[in-house]
Amino acid sequence: MLKRDMNIADYDAELFAAIQEETARQEEHIELIASENYTSPRVMEAQGSQLTNKYAEGYPGKRYYGGCEFVDKAEQLAIDRACQLFGAEYANVQPHSGSQANNAVYMALLNPGDTVLGMSLAHGGHLTHGSPVNFSGKLYNIIPYGIDETGQIDYEEMEALALEHKPKMIIGGFSAYSQVVDWKRMREIADKVGAYFFVDMAHVAGLIAAGVYPNPVPHAHVVTTTTHKTLAGPRGGLILSNDGEALYKKLNSAVFPGGQGGPLMHVIAAKAVAFKEAMEPEFKVYQACVVENAKAMVGEFLERGYKIVSGSTENHLFLVDLIDKGITGKEADAALGAANITVNKNSVPNDPRSPFVTSGIRIGTPSITRRGFTVEDTKQLAGWICDVLDNTDKPEVIEATKAKVLEICKRLPVYA
């Protein structure tokens, strides 16, 4: 018999210490990694529920195991809420991650060796959009498109490449692009060559749910997303479509049994919670503030003489190009980390350095906005970051900045 008062602290001191240390790090560091966010205690409650005990291969009403009548309810709630949130007719909430969701789309729509047009990783795309080190780059013939000299997606190049190579699928979406994507234009390009149009909206799903960024669902054959990042739910994936039953069946089969076995029912329940939270009025206010804060930070960086890729942001993230400053992304990452400010080094367009060093950093505002940073707080933070980047060789500047960070983190805790 299992006792309900069993806990990690009494049983596994080493693991408990690691968890406590990470909890403290999150509270005492300013999180600016664009793909990270803080999920609610309600989401974590669902993830820690007894639904983790249940195997449920298949889909609601069509399971391979008995005893699934209650997890069916949980999964159907997640499906219905996802459809309502994004204006979709179909949703699959079972992918364990965004990459798994993307893999399912490839499996459903393509054969190995088919040609795919995807955004270059060096210009802001994602590993699963055709990187040579990823399954997508190994199994398919990838033709990369990129951005122009202004930092905007080069739609003319994209169309020319599509007409030349006749891809079977065109991918829209990004991991490091700060502007608004013209989903309609991309669909028109896909239609010209008879290609599927697939959108990976993982980075901006929360903004889209709140109506502060254009929704690709009306334009794409299929859309995927993660359920964390700006959506602020549990780590997982989601597939959406409005393109008809024939495609829905292919997508379902590509997830199970094509790529996964049993779904994670506790995570699916947490997704249902997150989708409900994303329908609340305060979520819309939050997402609008995410964009306002990102714009405010960009303004401060520009005033301090820093180069921003594309010169502005229209979403939750932006890239700081450090080539002219004579410091690497790796050095900037380390210096800011010493001041309790967490960013990630990131390649910039035409970066002369390797992906392990880079010439830029990527900054995102979902996490700081979640903990209550205002525009004024965010401007102040941008100034602190510039102070550190201007003085990476001066420990006293880094220590002074760290003291300011600890003070504001105490004033604005993640979990009050």
Swiss-Prot record:
Cofactor entry: pyridoxal 5'-phosphate
Enzyme Commission numbers on file: 2.1.2.1
Gene3D superfamilies: Aspartate Aminotransferase, domain 1, Type I PLP-dependent aspartate aminotransferase-like (Major domain)
Pathway in which the depicted protein is active: One-carbon metabolism; tetrahydrofolate interconversion; Amino-acid biosynthesis; glycine biosynthesis; glycine from L-serine: step 1/1
Signal sequence range: none
Compartments in which it is found: Cytoplasm
GO CC field: cytosol
Chain sites annotated for binding (6S)-5,6,7,8-tetrahydrofolate: L121, G125, H126, L127, E245, S354, P355, F356
Transmembrane segments: none
Record carries keyword rRNA-binding: no
InterPro entries registered for this protein in UniProt: PyrdxlP-dep_Trfase, PyrdxlP-dep_Trfase_major, PyrdxlP-dep_Trfase_small, Ser_HO-MeTrfase, Ser_HO-MeTrfase-like, Ser_HO-MeTrfase_PLP_BS, SHMT-like_dom
Modified residues (N6-(pyridoxal phosphate)lysine): K229
One Pfam family recorded for the sequence: SHMT
Entry-linked CDD domains: SHMT
Family statement: Belongs to the SHMT family.
HAMAP family named in the record: SHMT
NCBIfam families per the UniProt record, alphabetical: PRK00011.1
PANTHER family: SERINE HYDROXYMETHYLTRANSFERASE
Subunit structure: Homodimer.
Name used for this protein in its record: Serine hydroxymethyltransferase 1
Organism per entry: Photobacterium profundum (strain SS9)
